[in-house]
UniProtKB/Swiss-Prot annotation:
One Pfam family here: HATPase_c
HAMP domain mapped to chain residues: 197-249
All residue ranges annotated as the Histidine kinase domain in the record: 366-583
Protein name (database record): Sensor protein SrrB
The species this protein was found in: Staphylococcus aureus
Presence of the UniProt keyword Cell inner membrane in the record: no
Membrane topology: Multi-pass membrane protein
Residues with the Phosphohistidine modification: 369
EC number per UniProt: 2.7.13.3
GO terms (BP aspect): osmosensory signaling via phosphorelay pathway
Protein's cellular compartments: Cell membrane
């Protein structure tokens, strides 16, 4: 109910009705009052005119009694006529009840003295009681000299008339006026409602449009064709709606781009407001925050508080377990609506970079050592032969064998470095051919038969000789050579090394499994990284460069396949190679 009363249509309609009703009431009151006054004045003027004529008739008549009787015949019923010579000496014996009361009014009302003494016309309303009811009459006294008396200058012609006819006329006029006002008010009500609805229709359309705009719907644009202020308001609102839509679209696009950029960042991003609440975060930040410990959280909170105090950019390193982060906090003047400030936290995972840097350092140290050792041996044994220190043929032969072995070792190290450099510069190319896998595995069997016997290892090859794979013979030879060499380093006499073939619907699978020392879990994710070495697990043979498994991974991926490792410390390691089947 209250919502309807608050409607502009109802308010405008009620306003029009109130104004029209007020005007009609005032006009009706004025009209009724005027008509009452008009008819009363007309009646009074008519009575006065009758009194003047009777006075003139009686004055000019020779037979005054006949003139009076004639006048009474004309005036009486419904009115009455009295001609009084002396108000103080009148007989009431032959008068009717009404005339007696009229005469009593004339005698007792001092206003009528002006008729006899001053010759003025006097009019009064007189209430007469007759037969238990009251009736109002108009009584007019008019001076005349038709019958002089010794007590007064003038005689008086008194005419009275019943006002009931005037009251009936006034009542009829009042009823007609009220009925007319009601009819006019009814018509005005309907017209006012129609007019207010018509006038406010554009406003209601604008209200609906404003509601839709507040809900995010900018497609509704009502057409208001009027040339008045409402039409101008509609045009301005439509233009404003279009501009708002454009701005919202621009903001949405900007927000989507910003969110996409933030979510695609490799750094974790957090937005912190003055209440120290997170108002913005990307997936990387969520992952980091879910996995950090309480000490790291305390570290972040301290840095955030320091940034709020200094209002400067802070950059600090955070080490947590085996991971390394760089935390950057920047103060922002306005990060929320209302001009509230905050801090943007950027957490970058530098673990890979740190490990890579560490591996480079280790690589330089290892390569320096690996190069220095064979070079020192080459120099030492050759100097011994040249200087004649070693003269026995068997000793010379043994020294030359050591020189040859160290030369091969140095050559292998240099080749690995050159291969990696060539891969970085030119990329890796493979020439795949559809050929039996047995050709590769037979080659490996022959190559490592003697080495397995020397090391006391049980090396087995299980494969289907008729099965064909799509691979590059030379590249896969390089891969298996590296993996079998590594397996021999991880094992001890009596352990097993098994090379097994398998397949699924889309891939050919090769397993290289050993029962050696295994690899610790913290190293598994990094064994294929460049320069990475698990030195603690190496128990036999010469030191490597940390590039072998990295090269293996590049070769397998260039084949369109994948290489993975599973290991359990103390129980052994399995490398799994998957290559796409020939088309």
């Amino acid at each position: 109910m209250m919502s309807r009363l608050n409607s502009v249509v109802i308010k405008l309609w009620l306003t029009i009705i109130l104004i029209v009703t007020t005007v009609l009431i005032l006009l009706s009151i004025a009209l009724i009052t005027f008509m009452q006054y008009y008819f009363t004045q007309e009646t009074e003027n008519a009575i006065r005119e009758d009194a003047r004529r009777i006075s003139s008739l009686v004055e000019q008549s020779h037979n005054k009694e006949e003139a009076i009787k004639y006048s009474q015949t004309l005036i009486e019923n419904p009115g009455g006529l009295m001609i009084i010579n002396n108000k103080h000496r009148q007989s009431t014996a032959s008068l009717s009840n009404i005339k007696k009361q009229m005469l009593n009014e004339v005698v007792n009302n001092d206003h009528f003295d002006d008729v006899f003494d001053k010759g003025k016309s006097v009019t009064r309303n007189v209430t007469i009681k007759e037969k238990g009811s009251s009736q109002t009459y108009i009584l007019l006294g008019y001076p005349t000299k038709a019958q002089k008396n010794s007590h007064s200058k003038y005689s008086g012609v008194f005419i009275y008339k019943d006002l009931k006819s005037i009251e009936d006329t006034n009542n009829a006029i009042t009823i007609i006026t009220i009925i007319t006002a009601v009819i006019f008010l009814t018509i005005t009500t309907v017209f006012a409602f129609f007019l207010s609805s018509r006038i406010t229709k554009p406003l209601r359309r604008l209200r609906d449009q404003a509601t839709r705009v507040s809900e995010g719907d900018y497609s509704y644009k009502p057409s208001v064709t009027t040339k008045d202020e409402i039409g101008q308001l509609s045009q301005a609102f439509n233009q404003m709606s279009t501009e708002i839509e454009e701005h919202v679209d621009a903001l949405s696009t900007s927000k989507n781009i910003r969110d996409s950029l933030i979510n695609s960042m490799v750094e974790g991003v957090l937005g912190i407001n003055e209440s120290r609440q997170i108002i913005l975060s990307n997936k990387m930040a969520n992952d980091i925050m879910d996995n950090i410990d309480e000490d790291a959280k305390a570290f972040l909170l301290r840095q955030i508080e320091d940034t709020f105090k200094s209002k400067q950019t802070e950059m600090r390193d955070l080490e947590m377990n085996t991971r390394f982060f760089v935390v950057t906090t920047s103060y922002i003047d306005k990060i929320e609506q209302g001009g509230k400030s905050g801090v943007v936290v950027t957490v970058r995972d530098m673990t890979n970079e740190h490990n890579l840097d560490q591996m480079k350092k280790d690589f330089i140290a290892n390569v320096s050592h690996e190069l220095r050792t064979p070079i020192s041996l080459l120099q030492g044994y050759t100097e011994s032969i040249v200087d004649g220190i070693v003269t026995e043929p068997d000793e010379i032969k043994e020294s030359l064998a050591i020189v040859l072995d160290e030369s091969k070792r140095l050559n292998r190290l240099v080749n690995e470095l050159l291969n990696v450099a060539r891969m970085d510069a030119e990329g890796l190319s493979v020439n795949k051919e559809v050929q039996p896998i047995a050709a590769l595995l037979d080659k490996m069997k022959i190559k490592y038969r003697q080495q397995a016997d020397d090391l006391g290892l049980n090396m087995t090859f299980n494969y289907c000789k008729k099965r064909v794979w799509s691979y590059d013979m030379d590249r896969m030879d390089q891969v298996l050579t590296n993996l079998i060499d590594n397996a021999s380093r991880y094992t001890k006499p009596g352990d097993e090394i098994a090379i097994t073939c398998d397949e699924n619907e889309s891939e050919d699978i090769l397993y290289i499994k050993d029962t050696g020392t295994g690899i610790a879990p913290e190293h598994l994710q990094q064994v294929f990284d460049r320069f990475y070495k698990v030195d603690a697990a190496r128990t036999r043979g010469k030191q490597g460069t940390g590039l072998g498994l990295f090269i293996c991974k590049m070769i397998i991926e260039e084949h369109g396949g994948s290489i993975d490792v599973k290991s359990e410390l103390g129980k052994g390691t399995t490398f799994i190679i998957k290559l796409p089947k020939p088309e």
